[in-house]
């Protein structure tokens, strides 16, 4: 199937690659189908593109690469809704915000992780309650000069 996107042009997507978000994503509840659009030069990041709206895409990051102490307990309700048999099999991503397009100031939303069951291709955004996490955790602690690249690394596989 062909999907129009504002960032990546027209993409050919296999319907079996779609991820179904039964409840949508907060503020985008009307959008139920998404797909990953990887960033080959930096596999720590990927895009989560809405299949039905070319303007809606979320930059995701594997939070465990940047925040080694990060922990998410998956509630039984979520495990049931996403048919997760073993929480270790779930993919966990954080939504990234890049203020004014400056990657050096990028932040990750650790209070609202995106949880994916890759086996059955179901996902949802979990809002953590009573946590120390916030919606804006600085990704890069050090400054990068304009000619330095940001290091890439692997993590979640999706």
UniProtKB/Swiss-Prot annotation:
Q: Which UniProt keywords apply?
A: Bacterial flagellum biogenesis, Chaperone, Cytoplasm, Translation regulation
The molecule here is called Flagellar assembly factor FliW
Q: Which Gene3D superfamilies match?
A: BH3618-like (2.30.290.10)
What biological processes does GO assign it?
Answer: bacterial-type flagellum assembly; regulation of translation
The places in or outside the cell where this protein is found are:
Cytoplasm
Subunit note: Interacts with translational regulator CsrA and flagellin(s).
| Keyword Chaperone carried by entry | yes
Q: Which family does it belong to?
A: Belongs to the FliW family.
Specify the superkingdom: Bacteria
Question: What does this gene product do?
Answer: Acts as an anti-CsrA protein, binds CsrA and prevents it from repressing translation of its target genes, one of which is flagellin. Binds to flagellin and participates in the assembly of the flagellum.
Q: Does the keyword Chaperone apply?
A: yes
The UniProt entry, under HAMAP family, shows: FliW
Name of the coding gene: fliW
Q: Name one Pfam family in it.
A: FliW
Can you cite an annotated GO cellular component?
Answer: cytoplasm
